[in-house]
Swiss-Prot record:
The lineage of its organism: Eukaryota, Metazoa, Chordata, Craniata, Vertebrata. This is T-cell immunomodulatory protein. Pfam families: C2_ITFG1, FG-GAP_3. It comes from Homo sapiens. Residues 1-33 form the signal peptide. SUPFAM superfamilies: Integrin alpha N-terminal domain (SSF69318).
């Protein structure tokens, strides 16, 4: 009975172990929740137009480039203490009485320091042509007095690409001196003809510099107007041995009247880039739609047509091209990111109530196709109408993804009207999605230096356009899974692309079997610049330094681990097991000691009894 009476107290020793194992086995319940963290990130400074991301001071923390009062650029540097983004660097363009229209950080002179390209509309503009100026980086900051105003103007915001494969960003666009595309080569800042084409460039364009031919070398994608019919079309200029030549021309979907900005994503998780196109079938966007054309195909497949919710019809906000804009014009844009880390990229869009004036940001989740119209694409978008903190932001103008806490989980940034006449309010929403899915975060640097960088600072923040990343792994069910992404493929019209790629892996904790990285190559070079790494740990950040450019086997990669919830749960379970084992050892030791004492007393008693 005494032994039976001790049984409950012995079982109590199992509780840490059982609790830990229960948590580990069940895991967190997936949840789609957003939490507004604007105050802790910005304090009272949450206003302006977020125009770009980049690591200005090379501290491996992404900084924010914000436009204010039409002609000021403020750089919010990431900080370890709240508020976590502080306005530290300011460049003013007030003396030029200009409206700044875009900001593109990059290393335009090859010194491994981040510079910043601004495009602007002069106050006295008559032809609506954009001026451009480069502020040069120095000592991990910007010198407002050290700048170069480009000697040509642009018809539209330029595309930042690596035209000659030297990993110094170049500036591509139609200038005031020719109706043919020109390229301003980074480094020596010399102008050259880029391409010979009869097509006109569409305004606003959504050109891209990304691999579309599955050879790990970035191609040039152009949004153009047919020279004879003036219809919208899309041209792929393939990079063949470092030279661009037109390989594919694709017409827009026949019934699309309002054409938005092209976006690129590995929509179906096959390792190849797909082309997404939002738009409307009527001028007022009463009937909105998103089409997709798969890699290597020419057939447009609708992946979202249902924009109605509880009797309310929503639609895209058409682009308004004003001759004298007072604010930055914003075209129909999909901002791509894997919100739930399932390996299938999702999107953020701005939609307007077609029967009212309400305008909000919505999350589009990438889900398996459930109807005949999207069968060819295998997947489709589903609108998440009910995301509380996102729904509370009225008059939203821009919504994009951003890894606020550098933990591999993509959070959301929304710009909305209403702060002042000329400035937006900035809202930041933490992503509390807790399915404990895995990811790999990859950033490819310029590789212009390795261990011999100026002031021994590795240039983490040079915003390199053109690298292409692809992985292969095995999912939780044992099937082969691929994923791919291009780094900084688009730069115009508030593309707001991140200087890194977060690739979701789903709930499989398997190592990545292969991770490939390719970079652009110069004219005449036939060998592809591509390197492979194997057995990459999930939930890690990989920083690739392609140095020297033409010897991929010598490229280096730095790996940084980001522990996930499962690591914490495993630690709890392990501690529980250790406590349990120590308790058992302690009890057994105590019982053995008691038995020894009892035996000694019996021996002593027997000795005295025998003596008598």
């Amino acid at each position: 009975m005494a032994a039976a009476g001790r049984l409950p107290s012995s079982w109590a020793l199992f509780s840490p172990l059982l609790a830990g194992l229960a948590l580990l086995g069940v895991g967190p319940v997936p949840a789609r929740a957003l939490h507004n963290v604007t105050a802790e990130l910005f304090g009272a400074e949450a206003w302006g137009t977020l125009a770009a991301f980049g690591d200005l001071n090379s501290d491996k923390q992404t900084d924010l480039f914000v436009l204010r009062e039409r002609n000021d650029l403020i750089v919010f540097l990431a900080d370890q203490n709240a508020p976590y983004f502080k306005p530290k660097v300011k460049v003013s363009f007030k003396n030029h009485s200009a409206l700044i229209t875009s900001v593109v950080p990059g290393d335009y002179d090859g010194d491994s320091q981040m510079d910043v390209l601004l495009t602007y509309l002069p106050k006295n503009y008559a032809k609506s042509e954009l001026g451009a100026v480069i502020f040069w980086g120095q000592n991990q900051t910007l010198d407002p007095n050290n700048m170069t105003i480009l000697n040509r103007t642009f018809q539209d915001e330029p595309l930042i690409m690596d035209f000659n494969g030297d990993l110094i960003p170049d500036i591509f666009g139609i200038t005031n001196e020719s109706n043919q595309p020109q390229i301003l080569l980074g480094g020596n800042l010399s102008w050259h003809p880029a391409l010979t084409t009869t097509s006109k460039m569409r305004i606003p364009h959504s050109h891209a510099f990304i691999d579309l031919t599955e050879d790990f070398t970035a191609d040039l994608f152009l949004t153009t107007l047919n020279a004879t019919t003036s219809t919208f079309q899309f041209e792929i200029w393939e990079n063949l041995d470092g030279n661009f030549s037109v390989s594919t021309i694709l017409e827009k979907p026949q019934n699309m009247m309002v054409v938005g900005q092209s976006a690129f994503a590995d929509f179906d998780g096959d390792g190849h880039m797909d082309h997404l196109l939002p738009g409307c079938e009527d001028k007022n966007c009463q009937k909105s739609t998103i089409y997709l054309v798969r890699s290597g195909m020419k057939q447009w497949v609708p992946v979202l047509q249902d924009f109605s919710n509880k009797g309310t019809l929503w639609g895209f906000v058409p682009f308004v091209d004003e001759q004298q804009p007072t604010e930055i014009p914003i075209p129909i844009t999909l901002h791509i990111g894997d919100y739930n880390m399932d390996g299938y990229p999702d999107a953020l869009v701005i939609l307007k109530n077609t029967s009212g004036s309400n305008q909000q940001a919505f999350l589009l989740e990438n889900v398996p196709c459930n109807n005949a119209s999207c069968e060819e694409a295998r997947r489709m978008f589903k609108v998440y109408w009910e995301l509380t903190d996102l729904n509370q932001i009225k008059d939203a103008m821009v919504a994009t993804f951003f890894d606020i806490y550098e933990d591999g989980i993509l959070d959301i940034v929304v710009l909305s009207k209403g702060y002042t006449k000329n400035d937006f309010a900035i809202h930041t929403l933490k992503n509390n999605f807790e399915a404990d899915a895995y990811f790999v975060k990859v950033i490819v640097l310029s590789g212009l230096c390795s261990n011999d960088c100026p002031r021994k600072i590795t240039p983490f923040g040079v915003n390199q356009p053109g690298p292409y990343i692809m992985y292969t792994t095995v999912d939780a069910n044992g099937y082969l899974k691929n994923g791919s992404a291009g780094q900084l493929s688009q730069s115009a019209h508030l593309a707001l692309q991140l200087p890194y790629n977060v690739l979701g892996l789903g709930r499989s904790a398997n190592f990545l079997d292969h991770l490939y990285v390719g970079i652009p190559r110069p004219s005449g070079e036939k060998s592809i610049r591509k390197q492979e790494w194997t057995a990459i740990i999930p939930n890690s950040q990989l920083i690739v330094i392609p140095y020297p450019h033409n010897v991929p086997r010598s490229w280096s990669a730095k790996l940084y681990l980001t522990p996930s919830n499962i690591v914490l749960l495993t630690a709890i379970a392990l501690i529980g097991v250790c406590v349990f084992i120590l308790a058992i050892i302690g009890i057994l030791h105590w019982q053995e000691k008691k038995a020894d004492d009892r035996e000694k007393r019996q021996e002593a008693h027997r000795f005295h009894f025998d003596a008598m």
